[in-house]
């Protein structure tokens, strides 16, 4: 792949990643970049650009501000006083449905052998020096 094609591919991927519509990035009829296309992609030298990036693309900055970077959840209409910026940590635990039967977990999981997939396949034997010390084995 020659350098021109690799640069075009890189610019295409960057432009699509930042939300530019496909019609603005790549025109199907004309595959060679012109001065107008270079200006729309921001490829001109920094002295040649007429507007800074934030002024040229207000839609992209508006999209970013709509996503929100706040750590607290959106305010609820319950009317409870809440300090701004502080929120209760949400539990990732999934609640059990009503009437669900709880399954008892094994407590001696470290005593099992585990395969490379994280599945247990057998109970570990006692250490070689502990032959006479294990009372439960017959």
Swiss-Prot record:
Very high expression in placenta, with the next highest level in testis and moderate levels in pancreas, liver, small intestine and brain at much lower levels. Expression levels increased in both early placentas and molar pregnancies and are reduced in choriocarcinoma cells. Expressed at higher levels in first trimester trophoblasts than at term of gestation, but only expressed in the villous trophoblast. The modification Phenylalanine amide is found at residue 121. GO terms for biological process: cytoskeleton organization; G protein-coupled receptor signaling pathway; positive regulation of cytosolic calcium ion concentration. Residues 28-39 have a biased composition (Polar residues). It is found in: Secreted. GO terms for cellular component: extracellular region. The record marks 118-119 as: Cleavage. The keyword Glycosyltransferase does not apply. The modification Phosphotyrosine is found at residue 112. Processed by MMP2 and MMP9. Its main location: secreted. InterPro entries: Metastasis-suppressor_KiSS-1. One of its GO terms (molecular function) is kisspeptin receptor binding. Residues 112-121 are annotated as: Essential for receptor binding and receptor activation. Induction: Down-regulated during the progression of melanoma in vivo. Diminishes MMP9 expression by effecting reduced NF-kappa-B binding to the promoter. Residues 28-101, 115-138 are annotated as: Disordered. Keywords: Amidation, Cleavage on pair of basic residues, Disease variant, Hypogonadotropic hypogonadism, Phosphoprotein, Secreted, Signal. Residues 1-19 form the signal peptide. Residues 77-89 have a biased composition (Low complexity). It comes from the Eukaryota. It is linked to Hypogonadotropic hypogonadism 13 with or without anosmia: A disorder characterized by absent or incomplete sexual maturation by the age of 18 years, in conjunction with low levels of circulating gonadotropins and testosterone and no other abnormalities of the hypothalamic-pituitary axis. In some cases, it is associated with non-reproductive phenotypes, such as anosmia, cleft palate, and sensorineural hearing loss. Anosmia or hyposmia is related to the absence or hypoplasia of the olfactory bulbs and tracts. Belongs to the KISS1 family. Metastasis suppressor protein in malignant melanomas and in some breast cancers. May regulate events downstream of cell-matrix adhesion, perhaps involving cytoskeletal reorganization. Generates a C-terminally amidated peptide, metastin which functions as the endogenous ligand of the G-protein coupled receptor GPR54. Activation of the receptor inhibits cell proliferation and cell migration, key characteristics of tumor metastasis. Kp-10 is a decapeptide derived from the primary translation product, isolated in conditioned medium of first trimester trophoblast. This is Metastasis-suppressor KiSS-1. The lineage of its organism: Eukaryota, Metazoa, Chordata, Craniata, Vertebrata. The gene is KISS1.
